[in-house]
């Protein structure tokens, strides 16, 4: 709603009110924001959203004296799926894994695809009491076969875990530490 004072031809002052419907503009803005923070393939949140949300969770943990955790997952030998079956089946697998992760209680809105075959899960302070259960639920997802191209395929993952604010309160440092822990798990035999 806009109001502007105008002068009529006879010199008298009047107010002119203009009303604009901005519904379409707001819907467009919301769609742009969603595209900026969402991975186009899996529908999970992306790296940019992860960094923003992780900063908020770290602040919350520090304010409340709570703890949270960052889990960095990398699919083991995913290249074999892509090369052996084709990228379209790799995409199907990534979507299936994303869907399964989002169904785990306590992390429904804190799963992120960092790119390629790497995922981050943030366990916020309010879900930290379920930390052990969440890790076990993730492991269960990867203990079962995935049905691709008329056959069952196993896909394991390696996981690096750091807690916050114990391991630090810098988003960049926490992601880097979890990534390093994940590569250590890969070096010691994968599927860990």
Where are the regions that the model predicts?
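Catalytic-core segments of nucleotide cyclases and related cyclic-nucleotide turnover enzymes
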Residues: 87, 132, 136, 149-151, ...
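A short pre-motif secondary-structure segment
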Residues: 109-113, 153
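Hydrophobic framework residues that shape the active-site pocket
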Residues: 65, 78, 96-97, 111, ...
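Sensory beta-strand/linker motifs that couple input domains to effectors
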Residues: 18, 71
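Hydrophobic scaffolding residues in well-structured cytosolic catalytic/regulatory domains
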Residues: 32, 50-57, 101, 119
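Active-site-proximal alpha-helical element of nucleotidyl cyclase-like catalytic domains
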Residues: 89-108
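Conserved nucleotide-binding and Mg2+-coordinating catalytic segments in signaling enzymes
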Residues: 33-53, 64, 73-87, 95
């Amino acid at each position: 709603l806009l109001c502007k004072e105008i002068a009529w031809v006879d010199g008298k002052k009047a107010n002119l009110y203009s009303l604009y419907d901005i519904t379409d503009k707001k819907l467009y803005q919301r769609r742009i924001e969603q595209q900026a923070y969402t991975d186009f393939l899996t529908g999970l949140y992306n790296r940019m959203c992860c960094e923003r949300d992780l900063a908020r969770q770290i602040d919350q943990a520090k304010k409340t004296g709570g703890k949270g955790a960052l889990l960095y997952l990398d699919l083991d030998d995913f290249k074999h799926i892509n090369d052996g079956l084709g990228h379209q089946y790799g995409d199907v697998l990534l979507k299936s894994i994303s869907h399964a992760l989002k169904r785990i209680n306590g992390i429904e809105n804190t799963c992120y695809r960092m790119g390629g075959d790497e995922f981050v899960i943030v366990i916020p302070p309010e879900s930290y009491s379920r930390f052990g259960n969440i890790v076990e639920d993730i492991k269960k997802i990867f203990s079962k076969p995935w049905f691709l191209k008329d056959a069952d395929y196993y896909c394991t993952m390696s996981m690096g875990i750091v807690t916050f604010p114990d391991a630090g309160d810098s988003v960049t440092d926490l992601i880097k530490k979890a990534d390093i822990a994940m590569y250590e798990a890969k070096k010691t035999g994968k599927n860990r």
